């Protein structure tokens, strides 16, 4: 990381590992992904004064259309997970205010049907398509600078999935 960015803070964020009854995990392909390589789990910023669980349910609803009554919170990550953006993205995302994200992750069990997932629930949409994948596939689907975090989250939640 460029030393000029080292003093920037991390953006507070929540991530959601949404699992179905078969133990597969929801991933969405980012709508701004032109190369088909940016699949990720729902995640997003925590608003000022917002608590973690409501933030997770809000992000889940905005990005997937899944209503809170269709999920059960199973676990919360023990610690925050940090990642740094590549230098070329720091000035482009979040108004250049952050060097990356500090994320708390929640594991949620999905009790709905696939038809309850609606990527058009929020405008603008976050994802262009979605699928269920095996947890071990997650690190290979995400952009490289987030892979370490995805490995940590899979390792932490593996026995609960």
Swiss-Prot record:
CDD domains, A to Z: NUDIX_Ap4A_hydrolase_plant_like (cd03671)
Top-level enzyme category: hydrolase
Family: Belongs to the Nudix hydrolase family. RppH subfamily.
Gene source species: Novosphingobium aromaticivorans (strain ATCC 700278 / DSM 12444 / CCUG 56034 / CIP 105152 / NBRC 16084 / F199)
Name of the featured protein: RNA pyrophosphohydrolase
Keyword Hydrolase recorded: yes
Single GO MF annotation: guanosine-3',5'-bis(diphosphate) 3'-diphosphatase activity
Biological role stated in the UniProt entry: Accelerates the degradation of transcripts by removing pyrophosphate from the 5'-end of triphosphorylated RNA, leading to a more labile monophosphorylated state that can stimulate subsequent ribonuclease cleavage.
Pfam families: NUDIX (PF00293)
Keyword Hydrolase annotated: yes
E.C. number(s) listed in UniProt: 3.6.1.-
Keywords: Hydrolase
Single GO BP term: ribose phosphate metabolic process
Cofactor dependency: a divalent metal cation
Residue positions of motif Nudix box: 44-65
InterPro entries to which the protein is assigned, alphabetical: Nudix_hydrolase (IPR020476), NUDIX_hydrolase-like_dom_sf (IPR015797), NUDIX_hydrolase_CS (IPR020084), NUDIX_hydrolase_dom (IPR000086), RppH (IPR022927)
Lineage, opening ranks: Bacteria, Pseudomonadati, Pseudomonadota, Alphaproteobacteria, Sphingomonadales
Domain Nudix hydrolase as annotated: residue spans: 9-155
